């Protein structure tokens, strides 16, 4: 779920919508939270309960109460999509009592939970519901932590700069220990980690999941459906220089500005700069500034994918890029169809495949997932990760990721 800053939260309060039996299994049942289904112990939850939901991709901290649960320890405290008792289970649902919290009714009659020690209250219907930082939850994939975290500490940056070297077992062993990280920092941490500041006009990419937006099934909005690619979010942006100042060009991952080779924090293994050079992004964006003189800045966002980026390599031995956003200061985000026409026809920048130009959501999530799984990827004719849906005006969007894909490639 995304918070008000459009940053993904991995742990948060929720209200259990329903609990249904699993045929043939008497000791467990299926809890329903929004569009998510989670296998839980029988009688553990009932509809209307306030509970804590941990989304898939969560890495739980190595402490109680998580370490008291054998099934979590066997999974190395990682929360992923899995098949359990012939059912799809996505996420983890835990009782507030597991953390020593209590359920209360405040003076205004609102339901909340409270920590008896700090007296702090959390409500399931506002920003206080988010518990990711409080509970110490991070991303299960270390690359995601580097890519999605607001900032990386000096040890992470040290490892990122020397990615190939630090992938070897001795270095990974040392990086798991505080004294080991300090030792390595003496030899590899001298380089300053002062990266360029994030361009404040660029919105970071993260689509909300349909499972957190169940009300959309009651709308008859028309959507443009595009293939979701399993890679790494990549942003290219240029800001027009004022007066005698030069234009400012940026290459970014999801949360980090990737400096050029002449900067002290340049990373040798950099797929983002590789794509910038492959498609001449600075030159393209400069041409677009000239074409649209009313634009103060222009941003192209997309996905870099291929060998070594994710487990799904799209049958490639190298990398490629496909755009999914074209945003200008004076127009906002372009419609997906118009973006494709502009970028591919005039600048030879490939865009994500368009699957449907006028799609209306079916009545249920199960039907939508059937649509997602109905065809293979347009890139290599293998399993498709999911679909991103954008409104015809380009303003609203969400994604539906195939649980079957997650089980195969991220389980």
Stretches found by the model and what they are:
Residues 1-411:
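Core nucleotide-handling region used for phosphoryl-transfer chemistry
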């Amino acid at each position: 779920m995304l918070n008000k800053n459009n940053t993904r939260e991995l742990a948060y309060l929720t209200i259990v919508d329903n609990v249904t039996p699993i045929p043939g299994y008497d000791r467990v049942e299926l809890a329903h939270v929004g569009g998510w289904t989670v296998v839980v112990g029988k009688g553990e939850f009932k509809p209307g309960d306030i509970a804590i939901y941990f989304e898939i991709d969560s890495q739980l901290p190595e402490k109680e109460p998580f370490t008291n649960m054998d099934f979590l320890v066997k999974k190395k405290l990682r929360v992923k999509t899995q098949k359990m008792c012939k059912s799809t289970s996505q996420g983890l649902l835990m009782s507030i009592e597991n953390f020593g919290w209590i359920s209360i009714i405040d003076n205004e009659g609102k339901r909340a939970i409270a920590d008896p020690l700090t007296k702090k209250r959390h409500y399931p219907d506002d920003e206080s519901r988010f518990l990711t930082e409080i509970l110490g939850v991070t991303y299960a994939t270390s690359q995601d932590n580097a890519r999605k975290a607001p900032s990386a500490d000096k040890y992470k940056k040290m490892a990122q700069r020397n990615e190939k070297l630090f992938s070897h077992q001795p270095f990974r062993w040392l990086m798991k220990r505080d004294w080991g990280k300090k030792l390595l920092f003496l030899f590899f941490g001298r380089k300053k980690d002062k990266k360029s500041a994030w361009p404040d006009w660029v919105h970071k990419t993260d689509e909300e999941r349909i499972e957190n937006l169940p009300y959309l099934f009651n709308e008859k909005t028309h959507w443009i459906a595009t293939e979701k690619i399993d890679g790494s979010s990549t942003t290219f942006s240029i800001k027009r220089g004022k007066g005698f100042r030069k234009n400012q060009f940026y290459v970014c991952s999801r949360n980090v500005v990737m400096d050029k080779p002449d900067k002290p924090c340049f990373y040798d293994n950099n797929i983002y700069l590789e794509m910038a050079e492959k498609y001449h992004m600075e030159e393209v964006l400069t041409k677009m500034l000239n074409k649209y003189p009313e634009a103060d800045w222009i941003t192209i966002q997309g996905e870099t994918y291929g060998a070594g980026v994710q487990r799904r390599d799209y049958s490639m031995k190298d990398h490629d890029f496909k755009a999914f956003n074209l945003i200008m200061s004076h127009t906002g985000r372009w419609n997906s169809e118009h973006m494709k026409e502009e970028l591919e026809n005039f600048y030879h920048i490939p865009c994500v495949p368009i699957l449907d130009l006028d799609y209306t959501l079916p009545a249920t999530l199960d039907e939508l997932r059937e649509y997602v799984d109905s065809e293979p990827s347009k890139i290599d004719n293998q399993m498709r990760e999911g679909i991103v849906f954008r409104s015809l005006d380009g303003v609203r969007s969400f994604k539906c990721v195939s649980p079957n894909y997650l089980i195969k490639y991220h389980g």
